[in-house]
Amino acid sequence: MDFMMANTGATGLDTQAQLMQSAAAAAAVAATNAAAPVQNAAAVAAAAQLQQQQQQVQQAILQVQQQQTQQAVAAAAAAVTQQLQQQQQAVVQQAVVQQQQQQQQQQQQQQVVQQQQVQQVQQAVVAVQQQQQQQQQQQQQQQVVQQQQQQVVQQQVQQQVQQANTNGNSGGAQNGSNGSTETRTNLIVNYLPQTMTEDEIRSLFSSVGEIESVKLIRDKSQVYIDPLNPQAPSKGQSLGYGFVNYVRPQDAEQAVNVLNGLRLQNKTIKVSFARPSSDAIKGANLYVSGLPKTMTQQELEAIFAPFGAIITSRILQNAGNDTQTKGVGFIRFDKREEATRAIIALNGTTPSSCTDPIVVKFSNTPGSTSKIIQPQLPAFLNPQLVRRIGGAMHTPVNKGLARFSPMAGDMLDVMLPNGLGAAAAAATTLASGPGGAYPIFIYNLAPETEEAALWQLFGPFGAVQSVKIVKDPTTNQCKGYGFVSMTNYDEAAMAIRALNGYTMGNRVLQVSFKTNKAK
């Protein structure tokens, strides 16, 4: 383009020079003609023509100048356009470089973040492994402690069994035939229908022989109204077993042979000789927890049958739900030695008919209660076991026996707020007399507390006859207090001493005997 513009400019200059030469020649001619004396028409015409040529030359010069100007402007515009294109290319290249740099920086940052995440994951894995190792070490330590505790309990239980066997043998020799005769006439009858009365039992067993006495064991804390005689005074709900004492041993033996396994209503009764009163057979009642909610009485007996003769068994049912139990049961063996073997073999194990490990403990400890129950307390108060009863337990504030004072009934009015004092005061008048159950008052229970929790809480200390939680009829929740009746005073006292001041479900329990309040 620059070459063409240069050529065009040169051509214009040549044309201009030629025109100027022509004008000069014409001027010379005109001058010559002017000098001549004669002016003719040809000269005038030539002058006019020359003038036109000059004008044409000037116009040509202007055109050439315009062309040159246009060419210069076009060249300048082309140069500016080229410069702009170069600048745009430079800007684009710079933007591309910046974008590449940003991408590299982002990739580097992502790599750093990924490395940090990998490090965090590795640290978390190491922490989890360390935690698992610590948990394994703690579990191993707990297992060692539990094994040591079980060994101590087993040793003491074996000592108690040996001592009981020794005492039983010596006692049998001293009692002579009198003890044997009493044993061979007294029968225990299990699995009686709850609606069956003493008169009906007497009528049934008197068909075999002469009866000296009949006693149906009842729960005095639960009211029972005879549907056939609603006006009759209540004697308490039947516990499903009783005793029949014959005059002659042969009649008692005949009753066992004839009536054992008899079907009455929805029950199959079990008739056997009552156990003699000796140390060898005392305290053979076991408390069992952790049972499946759907376990039947037959399944429970099948677990314990290999260890000895079962006198009676019981599974606590949920109120208003016949298909669900409380997961708690009781097994009474014929001899304490049999119960001991069952504890050693089954406690902490998972039988085939269960899904979780079961807890098997003595429920009715004879004689020196502290010798057997005290070693069991650490295992019972183990947090893993306490979680099953709905709350943690801590060391009591005071382990003294002052709470057993007869003044405890009066102190309830001071300890309990508002209307609960009156309720507790009324409860103290319900304490049974000598020979009956020993009722215990428990205060500061959580609203969601159920009777099963108290069964499991007090069961390991001895035989629990009944449990009652006082509920608000509107909300059907616990009012904050309840009652537990135990059949043995030493066991009840041990339970109070261990549980008063303990915490269950973030609540400190107040546990004391119900006593007759002075009027």
Swiss-Prot record:
One of its GO terms (cellular component) is ribonucleoprotein complex. SMART domains: RRM. Residues 185-276, 284-365, 438-516 form the RRM domain. Keywords: Repeat, RNA-binding. InterPro entries: ELAD_HU_SF (IPR006548), Elav_RRM1 (IPR034775), Hud_Sxl_RNA (IPR002343), Nucleotide-bd_a/b_plait_sf (IPR012677), RBD_domain_sf (IPR035979), RRM_dom (IPR000504). One of its GO terms (molecular function) is RNA binding. Pfam families: RRM_1. PROSITE patterns: RRM. The keyword RNA-binding applies. Belongs to the RRM elav family. Probably involved in the RNA metabolism of neurons. This is Protein elav. It comes from Drosophila virilis. The gene is elav.
